[in-house]
Structures are given as structure tokens and as C-alpha cells.
């Protein structure tokens, strides 16, 4: 899923939403439950 921006307070939420509810930011990458 799309990149995570550390300066965006919503980025973790956007990542999770993009991943269909399961997603985490690891550095600049948004990783879904499958790893990308």
C-alpha cells in the first residue's frame, strides 16, 4: 500500500484503511498483513 509520511498524523490510519483494516507503517513503507 502507499507510502507512510511521518509528518502526516493520519498516515497510520490511511495505511490501515488502504490495507482493508489491517496495515502498519514501518518507516516509509505501509505494510499490509501480507507484507506489502
Swiss-Prot record:
<keyword id="KW-0800">Toxin</keyword>
<dbReference type="GO" id="GO:0017081">
    <property type="term" value="F:chloride channel regulator activity"/>
</dbReference>
<keyword id="KW-1015">Disulfide bond</keyword>
<feature type="disulfide bond">
    <location>
        <begin position="19"/>
        <end position="32"/>
    </location>
</feature>
<keyword id="KW-0870">Voltage-gated chloride channel impairing toxin</keyword>
<feature type="disulfide bond">
    <location>
        <begin position="4"/>
        <end position="25"/>
    </location>
</feature>
<dbReference type="Pfam" id="PF05294">
    <property type="entry name" value="Toxin_5"/>
</dbReference>
<keyword id="KW-1265">Chloride channel impairing toxin</keyword>
<comment type="similarity">
    <text>Belongs to the short scorpion toxin superfamily. Chloride channel inhibitor family.</text>
</comment>
<dbReference type="InterPro" id="IPR007958">
    <property type="entry name" value="Scorpion_toxinS_Cl_inh"/>
</dbReference>
<feature type="disulfide bond">
    <location>
        <begin position="1"/>
        <end position="18"/>
    </location>
</feature>
<comment type="function">
    <text>Toxin with unknown function in healthy organisms. On glioma cells, interacts with chloride channels (probably ClC-3/CLCN3) and MMP2 at the surface of glioma cells. This complex is then internalized via caveolae, thus inhibiting the chloride channels necessary for cell shrinkage and tumor propagation.</text>
</comment>
<keyword id="KW-0960">Knottin</keyword>
<dbReference type="InterPro" id="IPR036574">
    <property type="entry name" value="Scorpion_toxin-like_sf"/>
</dbReference>
<protein>
    <recommendedName>
        <fullName>Chlorotoxin-like peptide Bs 14</fullName>
    </recommendedName>
</protein>
<keyword id="KW-0964">Secreted</keyword>
<dbReference type="GO" id="GO:0090729">
    <property type="term" value="F:toxin activity"/>
</dbReference>
<feature type="disulfide bond">
    <location>
        <begin position="15"/>
        <end position="30"/>
    </location>
</feature>
<keyword id="KW-0872">Ion channel impairing toxin</keyword>
<dbReference type="GO" id="GO:0005576">
    <property type="term" value="C:extracellular region"/>
</dbReference>
